[in-house]
Amino acid sequence: MFVHGSPRSPLNEYVFPEDVYNTRKIERIFGFIHQYCFQGHTHVPGVFTENCRFYAPQEIDFKYSLNEQKVMVNVGSVGQPRDGDPRSSYVIVDNNEIEFRRIEYTPEITRAKIHAEPGLDNFLGDRLIEGR
């Protein structure tokens, strides 16, 4: 399953790492997952497990093996990471393994374009520099 927000609300539900402390929310979300779900609305990469755990990529050496357990994977964001790392974030799925990857890009160029766009607030570009 691939969604932007969550399996329960595919377009716009936020699921943050700290939501693992809200067991009711996690249980309800996982009720919609058959096995694996990939999402990214919060732009914070990591793996959510059905037993209310969240693993940031660095906690799992940037790899996670898929098995019979239901998981929800936040792939992060190519253009607007929000985990404090300004590099682009994505995942590679190969066989039964997910690998989190980061690549450098020049957020300063994107920030300048956002600042030049009258309909956008400057903070949208400024936060790219810090990955927030």
Locate the predicted segments by residue:
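Acidic, His/Gly-rich catalytic cores of divalent-metal-dependent hydrolytic chemistry
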Residues: E50-R132
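Conserved catalytic scaffold of divalent metal-dependent phosphoesterases
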Residues: M1-F38, T42-R53
